[in-house]
Regions:
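Trp/Gly-enriched beta-strand surface patches
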Residues: 1-76
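Beta-strand-rich recognition/accessory modules
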Residues: 44-116
Length: 116
């Protein structure tokens, strides 16, 4: 998950999701979520990408005005076993890229190999 500094300007925080996602709280296994926030007068964009090989049932917590967001899932891991998952997080100064550009980044990330 990602959390900006405590003095983020809460009224300027907003989120962006893939085309068709209207309620992030009810959506599972979406490919990405993005956030725009302002800190000390500077605007930032954060893109959080989830790999398609991640455990299923993942939900994004991406609605808080103070900027904390991330992806969460539940999984049973037996003693001696491990669980692999992959997320990409990109932070940039300025405005978020357009939804289509973030989708292109997500599509490229989804083609990377996750080591098991």
């Amino acid at each position: 998950q990602f959390r900006p500094a405590d003095d983020v300007e809460k009224k300027k925080t907003s989120y962006l999701f893939p085309e068709g996602v209207t309620d992030v709280k009810k959506s599972k296994d979406i490919a990405w979520a993005a956030e725009s926030f302002t800190l000390k007068g500077q605007k930032y964009g954060v893109m959080h990408l989830s790999h398609p090989e991640n455990p299923k049932g993942m939900v994004y917590s991406a609605y808080r005005d103070y900027g904390r967001f991330g992806a969460f899932f539940q999984a049973d891991v037996s003693k001696g076993e491990s669980l692999s998952f992959a997320h990409g997080i990109m932070v940039k100064t300025g405005d978020l890229p357009a939804r289509e550009e973030i989708q292109e980044l997500s599509d490229a990330f989804s083609k990377t190999v996750v080591k098991k």
